[in-house]
Amino acid sequence: MMTIREYKRAETLEEAWQLNQKKANRVLGGMIWLKMENINVGTAIDLSGLGLDTIEETEGSFSIGAMVTLRQLEEHAGLAAYTHGAVKEALRHIVGVQLRNLATVGGSIYSRFGFSDVLTLFMAMDCSVELYKGGIISLQEYAERPYDRDILVRLIVKKEEAEFFYQSVRNSQTDIPVLTCAAARLENGSYRIVIGARPLKAVLFELPAKAGVSAQELAQNFADEVKQKIVTGSNMRGNAEYRCHLAGVLTKRAVLELEARTAQEEN
């Protein structure tokens, strides 16, 4: 059980940051995973008064506040159009609407859980995080960092000429995934393939364009490359060998889907 001694609704990011420097204090997100921990919290820091619960779309980017809920992401028309439905596909399996109305983007990204659909999804994009003291860094770099006591302010997704596709394998509809796969095909034909729930943290593979090969051959080549390089582990949902096999299967499916979509748009 989690016990909270004091509650503070931060009025500024500076105040939130100062409070968060004490080891016993915690920043509150949607309270999905935090409330399950057996911890004593000195001061619970609430960011809900800082205006971080909006998604702002401009001609060149999306700015997604840390307090935006997963349900807001799921229902955002601009993100749906930009990702060809990949955002909705990544989020719709996460437990249920009630939970997605509570869980926040900031909590999902800060936690960097191995099973995170959210982390897998955004790593396939040109995505950065803005930290209050640390500034703007790439999501990939942030995912590799150890936990610190900075405040995650927002995600910044730069729009690019790309097609996106998301898939996951689950033992049941709303269970934690056995493996996740987000793919992006860039305008020059190169790919970003992100594999999550290995059950380790999501990992990015950047695969260069290959001219003069069929979609089937390209998909098989990329699938083989991912299978050769990926490191997987075992847990109650699947063993390492099974996950390695799935990584190849999902990569191949993603490449075939995106190549078919590109060919259709060109015709």
Placement of each model-derived feature along the sequence:
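C-terminal structural segment of proteins
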Residues: 1-267
